[in-house]
């Protein structure tokens, strides 16, 4: 049983990657609960995956440092407390074998108010789950050495770091300076993508061409 937490703040790339991973886990025989804290998204493929929507929030701006409700209202302590309680109650009811956090603690540190209690709840279970961090190929660089140290310290609670990248193309240490502190528990998985849909080429249109999408959740 897998409890998979994901929070998208601006676009939906993080959510779509998490959904792809969740579907693959479900297809492999895992009972997966995907828990999303971002805006509800129509058309999200979740075959075989259970889904739970937390009270949604988003980034107030492109800087991602300030969080807000979907209507732009700043978060208050009551909202944070309520959402944290909902998350912890759900987690304790699930009693998962694996807890996965998308990006955290190497990103989404704005969500410490609920994710640190979640880690504590996991460690307090009679049979603590494996705790896994699932990250994309590049993480946002922190200008603060103290923040990097905090990430490393928080990662002590984790069993493994899954890096969804090909090290021959992009290496995690290129964007995370404290690689030496986490590398013994890190695994490269390769990139996460859905299988190519079946299609029939339409004549010569597009033949020999490549379309590149930058920033869409690869």
Give short role names for the model-derived ranges.
Residues 1-39:
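N-terminal subdomain of nucleotide-sugar transferases
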Residues 1-2, 99, 210:
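Conserved hydrophobic helix-helix packing surfaces used for dimerization/oligomerization
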Residues 24-78, 84:
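Conserved nucleotide-sugar phosphate-binding/catalytic loop shared by glycosyltransferases and other
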Residues 67-112:
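Conserved nucleotide-sugar donor-binding subdomain of glycosyltransferases
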Residues 90-96, 126, 204-206:
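Glycine-rich phosphate-binding loop signature in dinucleotide/nucleotide-binding domains
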Residues 98, 116-137:
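Active-site proximal beta-strand in glycosyltransferases
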Residues 134-218:
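A nucleotide-sugar donor-handling region in carbohydrate enzymes
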């Amino acid at each position: 049983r897998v409890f998979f937490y994901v929070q998208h703040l601006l676009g939906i790339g993080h959510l779509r990657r998490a959904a792809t991973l969740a579907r693959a886990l479900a297809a492999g025989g895992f009972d997966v609960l995907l828990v999303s804290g971002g805006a509800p998204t129509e058309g999200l493929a979740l075959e075989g995956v259970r889904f739970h929507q937390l009270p949604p929030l988003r980034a107030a701006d492109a800087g991602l440092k300030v969080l807000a409700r979907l209507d732009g209202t700043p978060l208050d302590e009551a909202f944070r407390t309520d959402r944290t309680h909902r998350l912890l109650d759900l987690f304790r009811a699930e009693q998962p074998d694996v807890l996965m956090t998308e990006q955290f603690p190497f990103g989404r540190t704005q969500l410490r108010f609920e994710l640190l209690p979640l880690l504590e709840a996991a460690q307090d279970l009679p049979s603590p789950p494996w705790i896994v961090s699932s990250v994309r190929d590049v993480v946002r660089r922190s200008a603060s050495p103290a923040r990097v140290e905090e990430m490393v310290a928080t990662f002590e609670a984790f069993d493994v770091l899954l890096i969804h990248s090909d090290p021959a193309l992009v290496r995690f240490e290129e964007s995370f300076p404290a690689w030496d502190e986490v590398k013994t528990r890190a695994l490269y998985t390769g990139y996460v993508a859905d299988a190519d849909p079946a299609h029939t080429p339409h004549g010569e249109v597009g033949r020999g061409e490549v379309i590149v999408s930058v920033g869409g959740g690869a």
